[in-house]
A protein has these predicted regions:
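Short, conserved phosphate-binding/catalytic loop or strand-edge motifs used
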Residues: 116-128, 165
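DNA replication initiation on ssDNA origins
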Residues: 1-91, 163, 171, 190-197
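DNA replication initiation modules
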Residues: 72-110, 131-198
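A signal for specific C-terminal beta-sheet/loop modules enriched in small/flexible residues
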Residues: 43-60, 118-120, 140-152
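Surface-exposed loop/edge segments in extracytoplasmic proteins
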Residues: 111-115
């Protein structure tokens, strides 16, 4: 039986025994749209093991169908999602949603991401470089590495280690009013993901 894409992605990104994940949902809106003062789709699921995330899937799918975007914190936090609560850096990441194709191709060729997440369209990508459990990178070092990717086309606003990015396996609901709800998907690159899954 195949696993849910969200579980496959999270396990490939961080297969450590101690791994936990922070999942957040909120109403998915286009940039600049007015946000609800009290968002009925805002949910925070802190310190979730992979098994607990599996148990959350039905609730996440229901929230997604109601118009929520499904996001996760790229690194491990203890409690509330904020930079000072990041307890373990598990990856270097970059948001290439606004990059041009030549920039994306150059990063693929030179840096070989462990995982590519395709958020919508042909040039909307998030790249991850999973770290081995033996690596010990602190928050300032990780953020410096993330910022270095800005020169290659990454979003400068998405370099913090407590960043929320879209979780594969769920629909991108930002433009549902235009009947555009692409599935967020992940592919595993030539670099070895942390969990050793290609």
């Amino acid at each position: 039986m195949s696993r849910h894409p969200a579980i496959e992605f999270l396990d490939a990104l961080d297969s450590a025994i101690e791994a936990t994940f922070h999942i957040t949902t909120f109403t998915d809106l286009p940039k600049g749209a007015e946000k609800p003062k009290l968002d009925p789709l805002l949910k925070e699921f802190e310190d979730q093991t992979l098994v607990q995330v599996e148990h959350l899937l039905p609730a996440l799918e229901q929230l997604n169908a109601s118009g929520a975007g499904i996001f996760f914190c790229v690194n491990q936090c203890q409690g509330k999602r904020k930079k000072e609560n990041v307890t373990r850096v598990r990856c270097v990441h970059a948001d290439f949603d606004s990059a041009i194709q030549s920039q994306i191709d150059a990063v693929r060729q030179k840096l070989r991401p462990s995982i590519e997440v395709h958020t919508s369209g042909t040039t909307k990508h998030h790249f991850y470089w999973a770290l081995d459990t033996a690596d010990d990178i602190d928050v300032p070092t990780a953020e410096a590495m993330n910022r270095a990717l800005v020169d290659l086309g990454a979003d400068p606003a998405a370099t913090d280690t407590s960043r929320l990015l879209r979780l594969p396996g769920f629909l991108h609901m930002k433009y549902r009013d235009r009947d555009e709800t692409p599935l967020v998907t992940a592919t595993f690159g030539q670099a070895q993901p942390k969990g050793g899954k290609q």
